[in-house]
A protein has these predicted regions:
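Conserved Class I S-adenosyl-L-methionine
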Residues: 102-176
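Class I SAM-dependent methyltransferase SAM/SAH-binding core
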Residues: 1-28
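Short catalytic micro-motifs in class I SAM-dependent methyltransferases
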Residues: 25, 37, 41-43
Length: 176
């Protein structure tokens, strides 16, 4: 389930048998029958995920969380707060929810048509209120892009964690 129609169309084009793509708000679209499994990729607070999963899933849930603590595209050091693997582990320990976790990395880079597009990207995603990157600093972050159409690339190896949780281990109080 995703709120973005393009994501759903892309998934449907490569659909795996037995997987259903749904466009909408996960909290508003409660299934008639609980799902066998749910995947929450870089999705919200752990408490919200547990609440949704307890109501909507009878099997395993998979949480993909960032395994770093600060925003990657900000000029200054800006905390991600409770949207990290460390925060998720703390919540699961506090609530006594057993889980397994696997750490891995994935390339989450961004291609750009121009240096100006890269500058707009950094301006948009900079969460630092007091610091900005100069044009030269931005250019220094870029490598050769994948094609003539996209001559610039910002490599970004993202450290992630995959948490696996049985929904039966989530207390009924979490579903409220």
């Amino acid at each position: 389930m995703d709120a973005g129609e393009l994501a759903i169309k892309t998934l449907e084009a490569h659909l795996i048998k037995g997987v259903t793509a749904i466009c909408g708000d996960v909290e508003a679209l409660t299934p008639k029958e609980p799902y066998d499994a749910m995947v929450f990729c870089l999705f919200g607070r752990t408490e919200d995920t547990l609440r949704i999963a307890r109501k909507q899933c009878r099997g395993k849930i998979f949480l993909v969380k960032r395994d770093y603590s600060h925003h990657r595209f900000s000029a200054g050091k800006v905390s991600l707060g409770e949207y990290t693997a460390g925060s998720t582990e703390a919540v699961l320990h506090e609530k006594g929810v057993p889980y397994t976790v696997e750490r891995f990395t994935a390339e989450f880079g961004q291609s750009f048509r121009s240096l100006e597009a890269a500058e707009r990207f950094f301006a948009l995603y900079n969460r630092s209120r007091s610091e900005t990157l100069s044009k030269d600093e931005i250019k220094a972050c870029l490598t050769a892009g994948p094609s003539e159409k996209f001559p610039y690339y910002l490599p970004h190896e993202k450290a992630l964690c995959l948490f696996t949780i049985e929904t039966a281990a989530i207390s009924k109080e979490e579903a409220v």
